[in-house]
């Protein structure tokens, strides 16, 4: 769904869908002066999403509740940070909101659940409070909250460069493709720790110059498998972080072993900093059949699993 970001809501309540993402490509190029890593990524939205309900109030206060008792609803939550940030853009200092999160994306899974929730909050309150910020303005705000937030706002299939906030569209891909996504529910991986571990092991090989960064970006742009990206030409998935996470994380190895056993899987990889892993299928029906045929094996593995179609957009208003 395309959102008119300047559209003002006449209602006192609305809901926003916040989809997860996977990394079809994640390449660590080097280290930036601002302390972040320089990345070359291809990210894809999938049809696994959180739902966030917003109710407008007039007391200037912002509150957050969730159906997940394990989720912090304090000031460290990106939803509250996003709400407080966009509240500063409103000319009405009395605007407030009661926010409720229905959590479906697993936490600490490399799926940008927190970033997508932040993006959904920017979109929801931009409309509910009548602020009228444009897509570019919201993406700029989002980049202050996290590197993945701009992608989550736009969604679909995007090149993500810089620390992840610099987006470039790619030619339209075959949206009928789908994934089986799996994760050990007892395991989380810290994204900062994953990058720190990668730097510790591979830092001596980092590129140093902008012209070298750009050569790697262009190499990704020119990759033959992107045109077309479809079931006859699946992507040769690459995730540099997998090189450091997989050897020391049994949950990742277990997930990849399970996925590799599924009939019809085209390619597989870890997403983001993990521990979630995914296998790509030609279509959703094929993914569902493959998973259903392996329910007993899935139960024995201790993994949670989802079948998710590729999604052509990011956060969207719930109609």
From Swiss-Prot:
Record-listed E.C. numbers: 2.7.1.148
Keywords: ATP-binding, Isoprene biosynthesis, Kinase, Nucleotide-binding, Transferase
GO biological process: isopentenyl diphosphate biosynthetic process, methylerythritol 4-phosphate pathway; terpenoid biosynthetic process
MF (Gene Ontology): 4-(cytidine 5'-diphospho)-2-C-methyl-D-erythritol kinase activity; ATP binding
Binding site for ATP: 106-116
Transferase as UniProt keyword: yes
SUPFAM superfamilies documented for this protein: GHMP Kinase, C-terminal domain, Ribosomal protein S5 domain 2-like
InterPro entries membership: GHMP_kinase_C_dom, GHMP_kinase_C_sf, GHMP_kinase_N_dom, IspE, Ribosomal_Su5_D2-typ_SF, Ribsml_uS5_D2-typ_fold_subgr
Positions of the catalytic residues: 21, 148
This protein's pathway: Isoprenoid biosynthesis; isopentenyl diphosphate biosynthesis via DXP pathway; isopentenyl diphosphate from 1-deoxy-D-xylulose 5-phosphate: step 3/6
Catalytic activity: 4-CDP-2-C-methyl-D-erythritol + ATP = 4-CDP-2-C-methyl-D-erythritol 2-phosphate + ADP + H(+)
Gene3D superfamilies for this protein: 3.30.230.10, GHMP kinase, C-terminal domain
NCBIfam families given in the database record: ispE
Function according to Swiss-Prot or TrEMBL: Catalyzes the phosphorylation of the position 2 hydroxy group of 4-diphosphocytidyl-2C-methyl-D-erythritol.
Family, per entry: Belongs to the GHMP kinase family. IspE subfamily.
The protein, known as: 4-diphosphocytidyl-2-C-methyl-D-erythritol kinase
Taxonomic source organism: Prochlorococcus marinus (strain SARG / CCMP1375 / SS120)
């Amino acid at each position: 769904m395309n959102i008119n970001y300047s559209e003002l809501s006449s209602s006192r309540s609305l809901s926003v869908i916040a989809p997860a993402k996977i990394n079809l490509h994640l390449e660590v190029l080097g280290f930036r002066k601002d302390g972040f890593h320089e990345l070359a990524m291809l990210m894809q939205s999938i049809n696994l999403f959180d739902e966030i309900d917003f109710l407008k109030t007039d007391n200037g206060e912002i509150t957050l509740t969730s159906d997940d008792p394990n989720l912090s609803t304090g000031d460290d939550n990106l939803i509250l940070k996003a709400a407080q940030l966009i509240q500063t853009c409103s000319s009405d200092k009395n605007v407030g909101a009661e926010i409720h999160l229905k959590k479906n994306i697993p936490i600490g899974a490399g799926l940008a659940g927190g970033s997508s929730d932040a993006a959904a909050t920017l979109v929801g309150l931009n409309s509910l409070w009548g602020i009228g910020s444009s897509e570019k303005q919201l993406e700029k705000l989002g980049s202050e909250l996290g590197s993945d937030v701009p992608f989550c706002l736009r969604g679909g299939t995007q090149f993500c460069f810089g620390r992840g906030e610099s987006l470039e569209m790619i030619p339209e891909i075959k949206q009928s493709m789908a994934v089986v996504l799996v994760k050990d529910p007892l395991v989380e991986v810290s994204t900062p720790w994953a990058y720190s571990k990668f730097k510790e092991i591979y830092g001596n090989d980092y590129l140093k110059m902008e012209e070298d960064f750009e050569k790697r970006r262009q190499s990704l742009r020119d990759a033959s498998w992107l045109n077309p990206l479809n079931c006859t030409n699946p992507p040769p998935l690459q995730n540099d972080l997998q090189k450091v996470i997989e050897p020391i994380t049994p949950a990742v190895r277990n997930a990849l072993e399970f996925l590799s056993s599924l009939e019809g899987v085209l390619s597989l990889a870890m997403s983001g900093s993990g521990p979630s892993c995914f296998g790509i299928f030609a279509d959703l029906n094929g993914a569902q059949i493959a998973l259903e045929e392996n329910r007993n094996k899935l139960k024995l593995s201790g993994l949670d699993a989802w079948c998710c179609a590729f999604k052509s957009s990011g956060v969207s208003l719930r109609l």
